């Protein structure tokens, strides 16, 4: 059995506990960890909140097994329910558990140490491995399939949208050319291809393939679509006083989280409206001033924390019916920026 306590360092653990635990003080409180991983954060939440129980969601069956074992070792298994699911099944998971409202929801959107360190997953550009990149190995789409089957236009789209890659067209063109004679099946092959395409003078810090690997991982796992679809579900299941705490690791995730939270932090009325109706008042309270970042000491101890952005809000009143309807319908909340409206 893998020793999860040594391979996994939870990012900003103290900050996360300080944000989550106050919402779990009452007997019967329920927390949901949407990205359970190896349960580093979740074990800390339960230890700090003896009156609470926790539902842990993960699409990675190996991580679920290790997390469950860890809970047993920590004596927390009686307050822990593991669920194999993607977090965009949030509402269904709660329904299956007979739960409607929850008091705290946590999301750590980074890769777990298990996924990074087990080279056969193909997540890391530092090791030569099959191009898999599935967080849930029961799902069909792999990174190898994306590279083999996507059109030039679709490859450009994902590298540009999900990797913010400046040389998307050049990389996609070389992939399409090369795959006609040599299938791209390993991370080493992809590394070498990107290394040949991206000019030395225009390389970001670190491995030049970093953005391409990020884009492929997001595409294979549908990460941004799942995040955008999950946040409204979470809001509709938060109890008043409940908290949503999210750690993101790249700008696309952070922008999505920020845009969603901002909906409930602002007055939803035109700036020239003389009297604002109650249902247009904010329903979230910001718990972090902007985003919390890792300090130099944490980065030195855990380099994976360097890019983290931690945001949190508390639900201060029931969500207005029209916002609940938008959330239920899966509205494109990112487009609902209320320009010219009250802050």
Swiss-Prot record:
InterPro entries: RsmH (IPR002903), SAM-dep_MeTrfase_MraW_recog (IPR023397), SAM-dependent_MTases_sf (IPR029063). GO terms for molecular function: rRNA (cytosine-N4-)-methyltransferase activity. It is an enzyme of class 2 (transferase). It is found in: Cytoplasm. Keywords: Cytoplasm, Methyltransferase, rRNA processing, S-adenosyl-L-methionine, Transferase. One of its GO terms (biological process) is rRNA base methylation. SUPFAM superfamilies: Putative methyltransferase TM0872, insert domain (SSF81799), S-adenosyl-L-methionine-dependent methyltransferases (SSF53335). It comes from the Bacteria. GO terms for cellular component: cytoplasm. It catalyses: cytidine(1402) in 16S rRNA + S-adenosyl-L-methionine = N(4)-methylcytidine(1402) in 16S rRNA + S-adenosyl-L-homocysteine + H(+). S-adenosyl-L-methionine binds at residues 39-41, 58, 87, 108, 115. Its main location: cytoplasm. It holds the Pfam family Methyltransf_5. Its EC number is 2.1.1.199. Belongs to the methyltransferase superfamily. RsmH family. PANTHER family: 12S RRNA N4-METHYLCYTIDINE METHYLTRANSFERASE, S-ADENOSYL-METHYLTRANSFERASE MRAW. Specifically methylates the N4 position of cytidine in position 1402 (C1402) of 16S rRNA. This is Ribosomal RNA small subunit methyltransferase H. The gene is rsmH.
């Amino acid at each position: 059995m893998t020793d999860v306590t040594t391979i996994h360092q939870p990012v900003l653990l103290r900050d996360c506990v300080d944000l989550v635990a106050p919402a779990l003080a009452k007997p019967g409180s329920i927390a949901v960890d949407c990205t359970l991983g190896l349960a580093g954060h979740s074990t800390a939440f339960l230890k700090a909140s003896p009156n609470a129980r926790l539902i842990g969601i993960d699409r990675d069956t190996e991580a679920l097994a290790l997390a469950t074992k860890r809970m047993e070792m920590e004596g927390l298994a009686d307050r822990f329910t593991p669920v194999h699911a993607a977090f965009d099944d949030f509402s269904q998971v709660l329904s299956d558990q007979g739960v409607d409202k929850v008091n705290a929801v946590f999301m750590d959107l980074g890769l777990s140490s298990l996924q990074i360190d087990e080279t056969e997953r193909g997540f890391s550009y530092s090791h030569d491995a099959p191009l898999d990149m599935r967080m849930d190995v029961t799902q069909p789409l792999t990174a190898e399939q994306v590279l083999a089957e996507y059109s030039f236009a679709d490859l450009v789209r994902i590298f540009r949208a999900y990797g913010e890659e400046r040389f998307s067209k050049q990389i996609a063109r070389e992939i399409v050319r090369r795959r006609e004679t040599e299938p791209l099946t390993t991370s080493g092959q992809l590394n070498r291809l990107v290394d040949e395409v991206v000019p030395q003078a225009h390389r970001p810090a670190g491995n030049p393939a970093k953005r391409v690997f990020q884009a492929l991982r997001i595409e294979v796992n549908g990460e941004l679509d799942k995040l955008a679809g999950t946040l409204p579900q979470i809001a509709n299941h938060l109890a008043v006083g409940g908290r949503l705490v999210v750690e993101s690791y790249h700008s696309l995730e952070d922008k999505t989280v920020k845009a969603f939270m901002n909906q409930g932090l602002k007055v939803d009325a035109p700036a020239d409206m003389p009297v604002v109706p109650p249902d247009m008042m904010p329903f979230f309270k910001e718990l972090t001033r902007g985003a919390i970042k890792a300090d130099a000491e944490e980065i030195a101890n855990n380099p994976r924390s360097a890019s983290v952005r931690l945001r949190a809000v508390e639900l201060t009143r029931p969500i207005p019916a029209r916002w609940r309807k938008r959330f239920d319908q899966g509205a494109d909340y990112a487009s609902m920026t209320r320009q010219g409206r009250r802050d």
